[in-house]
Regions:
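N-terminal lobe/hinge region of extracytoplasmic solute-binding protein
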Residues: 1-22, 26, 52, 120
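Gly/Pro-rich hinge or "lid" segments in bacterial periplasmic/extracellular proteins
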Residues: 4-5, 96-150, 154, 162-164, ...
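Residue-level recognition of beta-strand termini and adjacent short loop/turns
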Residues: 22, 75-77, 132
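Short, well-ordered beta-strand elements
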Residues: 25-28, 47-50, 81-83, 123-126, ...
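Surface-exposed binding/hinge segments that line
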Residues: 29, 35, 63-106
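Sec-exported extracytoplasmic/periplasmic mature domains
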Residues: 32-35, 52-59, 88, 97, ...
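Extracellular/periplasmic solute-recognition and catalytic clefts
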Residues: 54, 72, 128-137, 156-198
């Protein structure tokens, strides 16, 4: 995955760095003890399913453009997934971060629409609720055993599409961070002791 602040890749579900078997074959070993937010283990079947649903032309996924170099994905065993590429691709490991691994057993049970309304992942925060055009709420997932566990119990993302509203929320300390700082507001925020990075 990519670290949200530094944008540097790190091992999220992988237990070790990707292993290059030959020019067009890579293997990924899953991290021991990784679970989804419903407590079920993350399996190689989930990884294969997650990639195949994006690569399936019938699904018309926009994410396919980021992994169009992948020919096929298969489970070697219960811990190792093998990727066959159409051609050698130096950014293979970085592009894997574009695909989020989802629990096949949940989507099979409830369907894609219900899953989209209440997604289940495997990261340090689990989905709690969402209010359209308002906010998304997450809470720490205690069993998470990855590199970056949650540092707070709860996190709310305010969905502020208006740039002026985002800046006002940041200035008033209603928010602790914001994205897409308008260029014209950078100096004003810095003058109010706000840290601005690009």
């Amino acid at each position: 995955d990519l670290h949200p602040a530094t944008r540097e890749p790190y091992l999220a579900l992988a237990g070790k760095e990707p292993e290059q078997v030959d020019e067009t074959t890579w293997r990924i070993t899953l991290r021991e003890g990784a679970t989804f937010h419903d407590g079920a283990p993350v399996t190689t079947e989930d990884v294969v399913y997650s990639f195949n649903r994006i690569m399936d032309p019938a699904n018309k996924s926009l994410f396919v453009m980021f992994i169009d170099f992948i020919e096929s994905v298969k489970a070697v065993d219960d811990k190792v997934v093998e990727f066959k590429l159409k051609y050698p691709f130096a950014l293979f490991a970085n592009r894997l971060t574009c695909v989020k691994i989802v629990p096949k057993h949940v989507i099979d049970k409830v369907g894609q629409s219900a899953f989209d309304a209440h997604p289940i992942g495997s990261g340090p925060f689990k989905f709690v609720s969402a209010v359209k055009d308002d906010k998304i709420v997450f809470e720490a997932y205690e069993p998470y055993n990855g590199k970056y566990p949650a540092q707070v119990e709860k996190m709310s993302w305010l969905l502020l599409s208006d740039a002026a509203a985002r800046v006002t929320a940041q200035e008033s300390k209603r928010t602790q961070a914001m994205e897409s700082v308008p260029y014209l507001d950078i100096s004003r925020l810095k003058n109010k002791k706000q840290q601005v990075q690009s």
